[in-house]
């Protein structure tokens, strides 16, 4: 079974230290909100408050029609486009694209991740430079409704 160290280069996310505490990716998801809150409290002045428990880097662009619920961190040069819906517990890395009508929940997007068109990314960790094709979905629900 692949471990976090097999799958990810932890130098490409603010959550590298947090993820290093775990063996498997799914182990990190249950406490992600607390991780983001702790990271948010340590961010430098380049990150600006954008709402309750939401921090956005000053070089990031967030469309006025995007909806963001905390805890959430949006990294440098990231782009959150029209109609994006971030439901909380989301860490969006540097140079990421959260596209139109994309929904994020309980996720870590490493730097340079692209979720550009009509994606649902929930309970997931996407590694450095990952790209989600249009209309793709990740979730923690199996079609037979049993636990993942």
Positions of PLM-derived features:
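Terminal amphipathic alpha-helical/low-complexity segments used for targeting or macromolecular assembly
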Residues: 1-53, 58
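A near-ubiquitous, low-amplitude feature marking generic local secondary-structure context
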Residues: 1-2, 11, 15, 61, ...
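Flexible, glycine/small-residue-enriched loop-and-beta-strand segment within the central core
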Residues: 40, 66-75, 80-148
């Amino acid at each position: 079974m692949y471990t976090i160290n097999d799958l990810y280069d932890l130098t490409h996310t603010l959550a590298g230290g947090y993820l290093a505490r775990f063996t498997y990716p799914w182990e990190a998801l249950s406490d992600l909100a607390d991780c983001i809150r702790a990271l948010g409290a340590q961010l430098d002045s380049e990150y600006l408050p954008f709402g309750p428990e939401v921090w956005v880097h000053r070089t990031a662009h967030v469309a006025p029609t995007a909806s963001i619920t905390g805890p959430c961190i949006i990294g440098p040069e990231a782009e959150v486009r029209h109609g994006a819906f971030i439901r909380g517990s989301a860490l969006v890395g540097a140079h990421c694209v959260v596209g139109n009508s994309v929904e994020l929940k309980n996720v870590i997007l490493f730097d340079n991740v692209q979720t550009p068109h009509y994606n649902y990314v929930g309970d997931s960790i996407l590694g450095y430079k990952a790209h989600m094709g249009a209309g793709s979905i990740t979730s923690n629900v199996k079609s037979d409704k049993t636990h993942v």
